[in-house]
């Protein structure tokens, strides 16, 4: 009787321990699931508030008009800004001349260049310039693409575009030149798919901008005013250099350029001036 009782007690203990183990495992799994759910929530970026979007759209409209007013773009060219809370999205106008852009023309795209809201309006064929740079440059919050004539010229003349004065310190020791032929042979020169955009982004590297042979150029920045300011002064630097091609030019040294660039972040005075000038337009 006593031995049977002991055997039963042993079985009971094993059953109890087994049941406790299952309960503990279940509790741990439940806690793990809860932690994963919380981590997933933290990975999902919060949506931009209506106030954030309204302010950002107003600045993006202003950026388009500033670029047109300063002669950086004409009927072609474009500027984008990264989404303020979701780095995998960006805002850009639909297919439209920059000086005509309004807040209603702004489209939100993901990094595959697909409209997030299903917008069916025509888009810029070269939107891949923006998406592919945003993919590899998390520091970049805004991008400008221009066809300014003197920028085009500096991409084909055989002379490097270098900083002539302190406002163009961001050019540094020179900007790389993207030659689409090296990867894609004879084309229409446009960046019309992700592969071409990726090749351009690779040429850009960590630079503040790049020239595009037979096409134009790009500038990048940490904000809209930063990329816009750089694009305006890139054009000015190119204009000055074109006037003295073939002559001896005393460019900024790399160290002078670095020190000058440190004092020209975001171009705040220019931005306020340019914005006031253009936003009086209808």
Feature annotation, model-predicted:
Residues 1-11, 36:
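N-terminal secretory signal peptides
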């Amino acid at each position: 009787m006593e031995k049977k009782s002991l055997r039963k007690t042993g079985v009971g203990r094993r059953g109890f321990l087994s049941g406790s183990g299952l309960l503990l495992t279940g509790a741990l799994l439940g806690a793990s699931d809860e932690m994963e759910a919380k981590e997933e929530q933290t990975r999902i970026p919060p949506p931009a508030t209506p106030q954030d979007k309204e302010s950002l759209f107003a600045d993006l409209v202003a950026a388009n008009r500033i670029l047109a007013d300063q002669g950086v773009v004409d009927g072609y060219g474009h500027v984008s800004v990264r989404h303020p809370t979701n780095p995998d999205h960006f805002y850009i106008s639909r297919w439209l001349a920059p000086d005509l852009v309004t807040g209603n023309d702004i489209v939100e795209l993901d990094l595959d260049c697909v409209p997030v809201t299903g917008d069916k309006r025509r888009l810029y064929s070269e939107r891949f310039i923006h998406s592919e740079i945003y993919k590899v440059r998390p520091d970049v919050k805004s991008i400008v693409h221009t066809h300014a004539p003197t920028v085009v010229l500096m991409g084909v003349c055989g002379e490097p575009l270098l900083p002539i004065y302190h406002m163009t310190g961001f050019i540094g020791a020179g900007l790389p030149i993207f030659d689409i032929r090296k990867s894609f042979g004879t084309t229409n020169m446009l960046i019309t798919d992700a592969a071409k955009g990726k090749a351009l982004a690779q040429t850009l590297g960590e630079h503040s901008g790049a020239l595009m042979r037979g096409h134009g150029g790009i500038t990048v920045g940490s904000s809209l005013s930063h990329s816009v300011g750089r694009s305006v002064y890139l054009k000015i630097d190119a204009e000055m250099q074109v006037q003295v091609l073939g002559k001896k030019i005393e460019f900024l040294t790399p160290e002078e350029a670095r020190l000058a660039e440190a004092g020209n972040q975001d171009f705040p005075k220019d931005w306020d001036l340019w914005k006031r000038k253009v936003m009086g337009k209808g």
